[in-house]
């Protein structure tokens, strides 16, 4: 499991954003192309490992969308998209998020008090986006049953764990000017 994801990460191009080595990958960026077999690889691993006894799947715009939509189709669990755009619907919750390379507002709609949710996202690096999502879900009165992120890079997972939540990550990577190194994965087949 995850062979396609691991191999695709090892060949991901690297670009500099200031001093930040940014990897470009179909799961995290949607370019150059998101191949169905890559998405199937990722979704199969999430289905195998996530707590799916939930009312809703929560994902974050933009690259959480293919993950959330695919997972929703497979599991028949509805999904909610946390957007970067305000809709001004009743009950909308706005939270500020900051990442390693951007900041802005996120908007949560469609969550009711008591909803049991699974959060899925593409990458965790600084933990800024996920921390903001958790804060919004807590404000809405949701019960966060599980958090699954495809790619872990950096110390963001520890930040979320310090908030009292476990984060399952499918693969852990390091990125430098030479490329992406896969350091570990949710199954023991990474070595």
Curated annotation (Swiss-Prot):
GO CC list: cytoplasm
Family note: Belongs to the purine/pyrimidine phosphoribosyltransferase family. Archaeal HPRT subfamily.
GO BP annotations, alphabetical order: IMP salvage; purine ribonucleoside salvage
GO terms, molecular function: guanine phosphoribosyltransferase activity; hypoxanthine phosphoribosyltransferase activity
Keywords linked to the UniProt accession: Cytoplasm, Glycosyltransferase, Purine salvage, Transferase
Enzyme type, top EC level: transferase
Its EC number(s): 2.4.2.8
Species in which this protein is naturally found: Methanocella arvoryzae (strain DSM 22066 / NBRC 105507 / MRE50)
Subcellular location: Cytoplasm
Gene3D superfamilies named in the record: 3.40.50.2020
Protein's name in the database: Hypoxanthine/guanine phosphoribosyltransferase
């Amino acid at each position: 499991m995850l062979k396609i994801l691991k191999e695709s990460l090892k060949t991901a191009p690297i670009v500099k954003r200031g001093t930040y080595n940014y990897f470009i990958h179909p799961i995290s960026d949607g370019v150059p192309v998101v191949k169905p077999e890559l998405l199937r690889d990722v979704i199969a691993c999430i289905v195998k490992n996530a707590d799916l006894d939930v009312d809703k799947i929560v994902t974050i715009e933009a690259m959480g969308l293919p993950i959330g939509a695919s997972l929703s189709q497979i599991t028949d669990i509805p999904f909610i998209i946390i957007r970067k755009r305000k809709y001004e619907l009743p009950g909308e919750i706005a939270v500020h998020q900051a990442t390693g390379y951007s900041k802005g507002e996120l908007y949560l709609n469609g969550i009711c008090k008591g909803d049991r949710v699974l959060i899925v996202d593409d990458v965790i690096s600084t933990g800024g986006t996920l921390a903001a999502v958790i804060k919004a879900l807590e404000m809405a009165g949701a019960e966060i049953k599980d958090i699954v992120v495809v790619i872990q890079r950096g110390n963001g997972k520890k930040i979320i764990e310090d908030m009292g939540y476990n984060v399952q990550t499918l693969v852990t990577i390091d990125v430098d000017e030479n490329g992406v190194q896969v350091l570990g994965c949710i199954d023991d087949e990474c070595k």
